[in-house]
Amino acid sequence: MKQTLLFILLALVGIAPTMGQNALNAKADNIVGTYTGTKNDDRFKARITRQADDTYKAQVFWVENDRDEDGNKILDRKNPDKSLRNTPCDRIVLFSGLQYNKEDQCWDGTKIYDPHRGIRAKMKAWFTKDGRLCIKGTLFGICESVYWQRLP
């Protein structure tokens, strides 16, 4: 009885990562596109592109509230890389070097940048059943997920 229960439990653990996924996770280039998302009540649009080395990069190209109180473009002042602190908020690279993991049918292998906090976290991305792109960031064992909606 214990062996049967253990077998069922192990089988469920093996199936769990694929539950809720859809066909969009089956091909690496399905992630390429334009998305909209929200972070801390700030709406933005980002574009994911395939790079020459077969990895993927996401860059913001529009932010709803991109100006400060004085009308100046908001800059990436919290970036830990001092050379990037003058980057306008609508040009921030959120991640690069993202790789497709064919076995797990997801994208991983890089870090995502959170410009609100000025931190980079290990990331994993996949499409949910309803077609949204789920991006999960993990830092020191703490996880946070955001959902991006593909634009037509």
Regions of interest found by a model, annotated:
Residues 147-152:
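Short beta-strand-to-coil "C-cap" segments at the C-terminal boundary of structured domains/repeats
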Residues 116-117, 122-126, 132-146:
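Short, exposed beta-strand-loop hairpins at the edges of beta-sheets
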Residues 32, 37-38, 43-114, 120-122:
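Central antiparallel beta-sheet cores of small beta-barrel/beta-sandwich binding domains
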Residues 13-21:
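C-terminal segment of classical bacterial N-terminal signal peptides
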Residues 4-13:
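Sec-dependent N-terminal signal peptides
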Residues 21-34:
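N-terminal helix-cap/turn-to-beta initiation motif at the start of protein domains
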